[in-house]
């Protein structure tokens, strides 16, 4: 009975304030600020939380665009995670076909993610105040997920250790209750140092750092055949020179290496670095490398995933309009992927302890999951099989359908928080499982 009353109050409260949440999400869409530059975006979320009675600490943990917002007091501390950084080159006018200007845009839906998490925290804090629950609601602003792994930086400087449990979500083209395994990842740059020379008159006097990069990349592409099939790596040049008639004395390439365990990722990175050392030897150059970030694989929590499923079922599927569907279908018609049909996925698969979904991607929420019991949900906000990190996502993150999905996420996360506040056994089970994590 109590859960039913909490559910109705959460729905009523969030729907009463939904226009405020939509406006902030749309504003962050327009700001479209890149990692570590989210000044307006973080301020918008901070002001929203302050308007609902949260005390906001900013900047937080050495990051100017990070924050920590708190409301309530108690030993039980329930955390929510906001993201709000955009991606380069993915600006999209709000039309269902590709029309951008080359600027940054929200091709991963973080304008929705940040506001959805903040709204969940606001709703739970309201319910706690109304029912006089002895809990603390903490909303973390975690910038720079896309490039610098902001949560990793924050975790390494002491963040998240005040939480009992942490609840996260991400807008996607389907629903998931959090039994998704992310890969460990390392971001690192390899810099080669050689000798300059005229590329035509006296190239024999030079030692080409660019040639070293080229040979390294060729070697690494041959390496792909000889690593575990679950291992991925990708690269791009960060310095390839400005003119072709100079033998470059410095060139660099940026690599990402991924694997399903932290140990396997580190072994993969070392093999890539061995190839780089070989390229330096072949070209008579020197090699150095800089690791900018590394994230572990995430620690799953079946107790929290079960809770997420139950709350999703209680909230019910989002109601997308025919106009929503037409917009999504129009976007899909301009995406060269047969499986992107523009339909909305309303199914929710019941989580099972022995059925883990392997995701080829990575997330800095994995760092949080190593500190405190954590779950990360997916919520349908746009059409099925829409390719992530593309204009087609940007075209759908400022729509009615996106708002509907975001508000549903807020309802689910707030309801999860209310049940954790009322059912101490859930917290105990989540903590026990955290001490003995599931393995693949």
Labelled PLM ranges:
Residues 4-5, 23-27, 98-103, 192-200, ...:
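A short small-residue
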Residues 6, 17-24, 37-48, 76, ...:
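General structural feature for long, well-ordered alpha-helical segments within catalytic domains
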